[in-house]
A protein has these predicted regions:
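Mg2+/Mn2+-dependent nuclease catalytic core
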Residues: 174-179, 480-497
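Active-site metal-binding core of divalent-cation-utilizing nuclease and nuclease-like domains
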Residues: 144-149, 442-469
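Short secondary-structure junctions
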Residues: 438-446, 502-504
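Conserved catalytic cores of phosphodiester-cleaving nucleases, focusing on short active-site segments
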Residues: 434, 458-462, 471-482, 494
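Domain-level recognition of nuclease-like catalytic cores that cleave nucleotide substrates
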Residues: 499, 503-530
């Protein structure tokens, strides 16, 4: 057993001993299928703390032929698969964390030299009887070992993209690094499988990837590996039940990453949760912001303040709960090459700050935890209109509960005045105004939009969450160049809308009218029992 060659199972054993361990071992079924085939090159990209390193440790423990690890896997799901015994402890494993080597070196060249020397040292120590043709050449050393053992390598590279995050501007260093990986891995018989994980997909130059032999599984196209990184909804439900925590709250805080797996018969959508956040919430018995503690909101701030091509407007709309159309095809898979706002939004998907809907090609903010990071970032930027509006949404909600019609009208008016994109030219803009003005209402309500296209009004229904049933339900109808009485009448004629069909209790009917000539808002509120 070496430091990098056949490193053992200590890390994975630690995962199994943890208070919370969610079995993702069926990932091994997929990697077993790829062994020694044209599909043996796999690259998985996910945000921080989504279980990438744990999965790499699991694969190392499973394939490492220097130890018998059956005791670690015999109770896991993989043990029931027909490929389990066939591949258990059958390969030489090389496992490296590129961030470790980068942290120990001053330049990219020094990092690669150190990596090659350390791997060669492990190989020579493990196989002293092998006659090495060139002890300084990593590729030749691995060829010599493979010729001697007839046992190919499973190569696991964690944090493969760290150089692109640390050397953002150094294109030459990036290119040399990719050239090294290609020379080391591509078309090599000694590779049974090359498995890389990172945050970014593989860097593209022009229309081509330097590592085009890899099959990529990313946040925008997770493929058949969708369910193995992050916690699925059934897994989170089981943890909430075990730790006596509210599943509804867990969903509000951490759900929202919709990863679609394309199958022969249908598309299967996996609702994924951040594992770090869910585990911390269960163990602390408190819902809060945990995933984002891995890096401050400054990381998000850097990108959303690049107000190119309407980026600020898109962020404001997403804060209001809307989705924004996006073209992910122009993204260069790095952190500096941005031609349009779509490239920045695509990067935010890979970083975990947005979720991508492959069906309608839109992005949105996934959950409360991530939304709070946007609020934190905006509060320190020059977006004063947005920051002030979010801050004052507390008072607007209290005014609504107090039936203060003038204060509610003033709050909606403030949103309309201070945010340039909120022009009343369609139903989406109407609802965006209401959602942003009542941003804080999400603490208490599920907010549902009903937008009859072309009718000149927008319905917003606020249904109290289970733990806030003491609050009234709310229906808001915003119209332009009509009147508030007509708005209230229309709510009643529609029997409160579809969203409140099953609701019983107190309902606030809120009619808001905008007069285009006076540019003033009027508000009328009625209290009803349903």
């Amino acid at each position: 057993m070496g430091s990098y060659l056949n490193p053992g199972n200590f890390s994975f054993r630690g995962s199994l001993r943890s208070k919370i361990y969610v079995d993702k071992s069926e990932l091994i079924v997929k990697t077993n299928e790829a062994l020694c085939t044209e599909q043996k090159y796999i690259c998985v990209s996910r945000p921080r703390r989504f279980g990438k390193s744990m999965a790499a440790n699991m694969l190392a423990a499973y394939y490492d032929r220097s130890e018998n690890t059956e005791e670690l896997f015999h109770n896991l799901a993989i043990s029931k698969d027909k490929s389990y015994k066939e591949n258990l402890n059958q390969y030489d494993v090389i496992k490296i964390n590129m961030q470790e080597f980068l942290s120990m070196s001053e330049t990219m060249e020094e990092m690669l030299e150190m990596l090659k020397n350390y791997l060669v040292a492990d190989l020579e120590e493990t196989y002293p009887k092998v006659r090495f043709r060139d002890g300084k050449n990593l590729i030749q050393v691995m060829k010599d070992v493979f010729s001697y053992t007839k046992c190919p390598f499973v190569i696991l590279i964690d944090e493969w993209d760290c150089l692109f995050r640390e050397y953002k501007q150094n294109k030459e260093a990036q290119r040399k690094y990719l050239d090294f990986l290609r020379a080391w891995l591509k078309d090599k018989d000694y590779v049974a499988m090359a498995y890389m994980t990172g945050i970014l997909p593989i860097k593209k130059y022009g229309s081509h990837s330097a590592l085009n032999m890899f099959t990529e599984y990313s946040m925008t196209d997770p493929g058949e590996l969708a369910e193995y990184f992050g916690f699925t909804e059934p897994e989170v439900f089981g943890l909430c039940d075990k730790y006596e925590m509210s599943f509804e709250k867990a969903k509000i805080w951490y759900d929202g990453y919709q990863l679609v797996e394309h199958k022969k018969e249908k598309e299967e959508c996996h609702s994924m949760y951040s594992p770090k956040s869910v585990v911390e919430a269960m163990l602390r018995h408190r819902f809060g912001t945990y995933w984002n503690q891995t890096e401050t909101y400054e990381a998000l701030k850097i990108y959303i303040q690049m107000d190119m091509d309407g980026l600020k407007d898109s962020v404001v709309r997403m804060l209001a709960g809307e989705s924004v159309s996006i073209n992910i095809g122009t993204f260069s898979n790095d952190m500096t090459t941005f031609a349009t706002q779509d490239d920045i939004l695509t990067l935010l998907v890979h970083l975990g700050y947005l979720t991508y809907n492959v069906t309608d090609q839109t992005v949105r903010i996934p959950n409360k935890e991530v939304s709070q990071e946007y609020v934190n970032a905006i509060s320190t930027m020059s977006w004063h209109g947005v920051a002030d509006l979010l801050d004052s949404s507390h008072k607007l909600l209290e005014a609504l509960w107090a039936l203060d019609e003038e204060a509610v009208a003033a709050g909606i008016e403030k949103a309309h005045e201070e945010i340039p994109i909120l022009q009343y030219n369609d139903e989406n803009s109407l609802s965006c105004t209401i959602n942003l003005a009542f941003y804080f209402a999400r603490e208490y309500y599920s907010i549902i939009r009903e937008l009859p296209t072309g009718k000149g009004f927008a319905d917003i229904c606020m249904i109290p969450r289970q733990e806030h049933l003491d609050k009234p339900a709310v229906i808001i109808e915003l119209k332009w160049d009509k009147n508030t009485i007509g708005a209230l009448k229309q709510i009643k004629e529609k029997n409160y809308g579809n969203a409140l069909k099953a609701y019983q209790g107190k309902v606030l009917l809120v009619g808001i009218n905008y007069n285009k000539k006076s540019k003033k808002h009027e508000c009328a509120i009625e209290v009803m029992e349903k």
